[in-house]
Structure formats: structure tokens, C-alpha cells
Amino acid sequence: SLLLTACGVGKDRVRFEGKLENINDAEFYIYSDEGGFEGVDTIRIQDGEFVYERKLLRPVLASLLYPNFTQSHVILEPGKTIKMKGDASRVGEAKITGTEENELLTDFRTDQIGKSEANRFLAAEQFIRQHAGTMAAVAVFKAYFATSRQKNVKLSMEMLQTLHKAQPKNYAVNYLWNFYQPIFMNGVGEQLPEFSAETTEGKQVTQKDFEGKKLLVVAVGFWTPDSRTFLKELKKKLDAAGNPFEVLLVSLDVDRGSLRKQLQQIDVNYPVICDRQSFNSPLVGTFGLRYVPSAMVVNSQGKIVQRDVTEGDKLNLNI
């Protein structure tokens, strides 16, 4: 550590150190959703202090997940030492310094303390427009627009487009673009997109087959037992409601034989699309399906009224 203090951090490494009050020994996690680095690292706090160092070849937006399940972001840059200081009970408000972008992000976070949610969202929009070329703006987008709390899907899409236009080669922006664009394009209030696919029985289906009908598009994957539970709950709920919906299952499984057995075991005979491409399936991309299991609810006018519903009891069938 003496050598580090004397020479500083190497050009291909980053150092993240901090001091938190009102905590002795604990740990939290650091990771990159967008692929800035692989895996999840554990940062250990001892006597209220921590030091974390890793190899880094480019600036990375990293997520910090704390023991109380709150989350914040830090921008890691090669050759830099980044410092965090604050109170453990309000760790999301801790000051992060050491680079211009982290200080910009800290100033924004500090300015939002005590503001109403509406004013915070307005400030986030203004921040992204003003600082669209920064990684700090990407962090603000993730905190405010890549969240179920944001109901204005059109504004979320506009913010994503603003970032993409300003940073077309930024790996994090491109990841968010590919992930969220289909979701925003098919958000609540939007029309069911045009599609064409073949069921496991060899029948061609398109959006026209469901015109004038209520539809549930259900994403399943039987590598997780949650899909069995979700479908059982769904079937029970539909039976109780007099089954007023058409159901289209989109399976992300790669083994059709195993899929067929699973569906037979729970007595489900809805039409199934399974092209064995999992999350790379063109149809999955068209619908913006990202959670397994989950459901999208479409009314008889072809309008999406719910999406990404991951719990059966949260489904609204009274439309």
C-alpha cells in the first residue's frame, strides 16, 4: 500500500476508496449491468473504511448495491482514485469525488434531496439534455427513466434517444439502447406491434389474428420453476374470469421436447412460439420481452395496458 500511495494508481487500473460514518464492518457489491466488467465484486468495509482496486481499460458506469438494498452509481475511470464519503444510514447521498463526472453526478444527487418526485424527474430530464455527452447522464437515465416509477414512456424514449445521439459509440449507451428501446416502443398505451411467427404446431400467427380480442402475451422459460407457478396461477385466474383472453406463449426454452412435457404436466394448451433462440429471438426483441416469466396485457383495441407483469396476482384482467 505504501507503493500505491507513493506512485498512485496505474494507468490501466482504478482505485475506489471510502469512509462511511456509523458503520464498522459490512460489505456491499459493485458490478456493471452494461458489461463494463464481468461478474460481481464484493467490497468489504472495515472500521468504516474500504479500498477497492481493479484493472480497467475504459470508463465504466458501475452499480453499487448496499446491504439495505438501495442502489447508487459510480463512474470508474482508468488511472483515477475515486473517493466516497458519507453516512452509512444515507449511503445513497454519499459524496463521490475524484473525477469531474463523479462530482457532477454527486452535485445532481445532492440537489435532489428534499425535492418532490415530480421536481426530481424534471431535474433529471434537464440534466440529461444539458450533459448528454457524459457518463453521469447515463447514470441519471438509469436512476430515473429505466425504472417502473417512470410512467411517461415517450419521455423515457426521448431521453434514451438524446443519449444515443450524443454518445453513439458508448458501450453502455448502446447496451441501454438495445435493452430499453423495444420496451419503450411497446410501452403501456402503445399498440401491439406487427409480428409474424410460427407456433410449435406449425401454424403461422400474426397480430391480425388477435384483432378485436383481448390478448395475453406470456414469456416463459422452464429453466426456472417460477414459470410453472406463473402459468398455473394464470390458468386458474383465467378460468375464474370465464377465460375472456386469447393467450400466446412465447417460450425462451431451447429444448422443445422438454417444453412440451412441462406444458402437458400443468395441462396448458395455449399456442406456443419457441424458435429456440431464447433472448436472441426476433419475436422477443419485437415485444421487448426481458423478464421470465412475465405477461403483457393487450385490450380488444390492440392497446398494451400492462407489461412486464412478473406476478400472477398483479395481472389486471378487468379491461
Task: Show where each model-derived region lies.
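Sec-dependent bacterial lipoprotein signal peptides
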Residues: 1-5
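N-terminal targeting signals for export/organelle localization
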Residues: 7-8, 117-188
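Short, small/polar residue-rich loop motifs at catalytic or cofactor-binding pockets
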Residues: 37-38, 191, 290-292
